[in-house]
């Protein structure tokens, strides 16, 4: 792999080239094609996937809480993911990996029925109707998630936008997912504490007084 020297971009260190160089060089980061070429031991180790992970900090915190699981934070923007990647390296958290890829590529990146959990945290709601197909809870994506989850595996969603959250619940029910846990105000609920691990967006919305919706759903006979 070609080494990119972040110091070449030191004058513009707040810009994307500097952050992309850091992502490129991190041992726990993979471009889409690099992940596809990784050893089976690496690719098949993943048990929890976060789609649209942003900085990946949510996955880092969950990985710290669950050292026996292997987490993958996936996002199309490597300049964002590098933040979580370097935080994990600095803290010695080795059970979280970072993949730069689009959400619609996950079927190529992970084996069928290989994941215990799949997290979607504060995705773009794409409020315009003509953009509904881009929502990460659109039926097209839900069918992909179903193929990736193990029997009994869970899909979890957190969001502050009530309209998007309710629309997502409708899609889950329509696609015959079973709602196992649900709250329209996560941080005032009795749901597990790990669900309340904060993302950067979550901290922002809560500071503005917004309630966070959270749902866990399964397919088939999952619990």
Spans of model-derived segments:
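Class I S-adenosyl-L-methionine
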Residues: 175-223
